[in-house]
């Protein structure tokens, strides 16, 4: 079996490398600006101590909070069919309500609005 897999995978790798080398010159970018790195809207060659807007910081913190909460919910929600205790179900509902209230609070005070009206 390995005698068939090894030559097949090597020939596939070689074929893909040849295709890449033949087509790499077809997609050259004319603009120098397209080749420069783009990182959070800042010029990488500018002063690194320039102040960052608080909107980036708030958005990052909110993303981390909701990301951690979603990661915590995945194992719990996968076990819902095995749970029969009302205490566990009520704790899940309470956790979801806290998430929903936090999201509504942020929407009400305009934290999630990127462009101010």
Swiss-Prot record:
<protein>
    <recommendedName>
        <fullName>NADH-ubiquinone oxidoreductase chain 3</fullName>
        <ecNumber>7.1.1.2</ecNumber>
    </recommendedName>
</protein>
<keyword id="KW-0472">Membrane</keyword>
<dbReference type="GO" id="GO:0008137">
    <property type="term" value="F:NADH dehydrogenase (ubiquinone) activity"/>
</dbReference>
<keyword id="KW-0812">Transmembrane</keyword>
<dbReference type="GO" id="GO:0031966">
    <property type="term" value="C:mitochondrial membrane"/>
</dbReference>
<keyword id="KW-0496">Mitochondrion</keyword>
<dbReference type="Pfam" id="PF00507">
    <property type="entry name" value="Oxidored_q4"/>
</dbReference>
<keyword id="KW-0520">NAD</keyword>
<dbReference type="GO" id="GO:0030964">
    <property type="term" value="C:NADH dehydrogenase complex"/>
</dbReference>
<keyword id="KW-0813">Transport</keyword>
<keyword id="KW-0249">Electron transport</keyword>
<dbReference type="InterPro" id="IPR038430">
    <property type="entry name" value="NDAH_ubi_oxred_su3_sf"/>
</dbReference>
<keyword id="KW-0830">Ubiquinone</keyword>
<comment type="function">
    <text>Core subunit of the mitochondrial membrane respiratory chain NADH dehydrogenase (Complex I) that is believed to belong to the minimal assembly required for catalysis. Complex I functions in the transfer of electrons from NADH to the respiratory chain. The immediate electron acceptor for the enzyme is believed to be ubiquinone.</text>
</comment>
<keyword id="KW-1133">Transmembrane helix</keyword>
<feature type="transmembrane region" description="Helical">
    <location>
        <begin position="56"/>
        <end position="76"/>
    </location>
</feature>
<feature type="transmembrane region" description="Helical">
    <location>
        <begin position="2"/>
        <end position="22"/>
    </location>
</feature>
<feature type="transmembrane region" description="Helical">
    <location>
        <begin position="85"/>
        <end position="105"/>
    </location>
</feature>
<comment type="similarity">
    <text>Belongs to the complex I subunit 3 family.</text>
</comment>
<dbReference type="InterPro" id="IPR000440">
    <property type="entry name" value="NADH_UbQ/plastoQ_OxRdtase_su3"/>
</dbReference>
<keyword id="KW-0679">Respiratory chain</keyword>
<keyword id="KW-1278">Translocase</keyword>
């Amino acid at each position: 079996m390995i005698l068939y897999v090894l030559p097949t995978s090597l020939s596939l790798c070689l074929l893909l490398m040849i295709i890449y080398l033949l087509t790499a010159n077809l997609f050259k970018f004319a603009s120098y600006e397209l080749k420069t790195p783009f990182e959070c809207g800042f010029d990488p060659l500018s002063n690194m101590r320039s102040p960052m807007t608080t909107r980036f910081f708030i958005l990052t913190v909110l993303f981390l909070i909701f990301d951690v909460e979603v990661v915590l919910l995945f194992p719990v929600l996968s076990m819902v069919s095995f749970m029969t205790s009302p205490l566990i179900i009520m704790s899940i509902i309470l956790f979801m309500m806290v998430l929903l209230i936090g999201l509504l609070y942020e929407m009400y005070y305009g934290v999630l609005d990127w462009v101010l009206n």
